[in-house]
Amino acid sequence: MAKFNVLDHNLVPEHHIVSEEEEKTILKELGIEKEFLPRISPNDPVIKALEAIHGKIKDGTVIKIIRNSPTMGHSVYYRVVASEVFK
């Protein structure tokens, strides 16, 4: 059975790992602490696909999500990888 890469699906938005330097800039621009970002589970299929490319992604890593829209062009979202998604 062939492996399916969820990142190649047309309904899955672009996901990128944010560098620590870029993370500081983003959090400063947004005026928030990392703990206030929405969370994404390390078991999310997209995180697993990114790990296949980049290696293990640890808790606290910020992920940049770029969603395309026919009406808005695109919008950027950020999520932080967290084992405890619901507190």
Swiss-Prot record:
SUPFAM superfamilies: RPB5-like RNA polymerase subunit (SSF55287). Keywords: Cytoplasm, DNA-directed RNA polymerase, Nucleotidyltransferase, Transcription, Transferase. It comes from the Archaea. One of its GO terms (biological process) is transcription elongation by RNA polymerase I. It is found in: Cytoplasm. One of its GO terms (cellular component) is cytoplasm. The keyword Phosphoprotein does not apply. One of its GO terms (molecular function) is DNA-directed RNA polymerase activity. Its EC number is 2.7.7.6. Belongs to the archaeal Rpo5/eukaryotic RPB5 RNA polymerase subunit family. NCBIfam families: PRK09570.1 (NF007129). PANTHER family: DNA-DIRECTED RNA POLYMERASES I, II, AND III SUBUNIT RPABC1. Part of the RNA polymerase complex. DNA-dependent RNA polymerase (RNAP) catalyzes the transcription of DNA into RNA using the four ribonucleoside triphosphates as substrates. This is DNA-directed RNA polymerase subunit Rpo5. It comes from Thermoplasma volcanium (strain ATCC 51530 / DSM 4299 / JCM 9571 / NBRC 15438 / GSS1). The gene is rpo5.
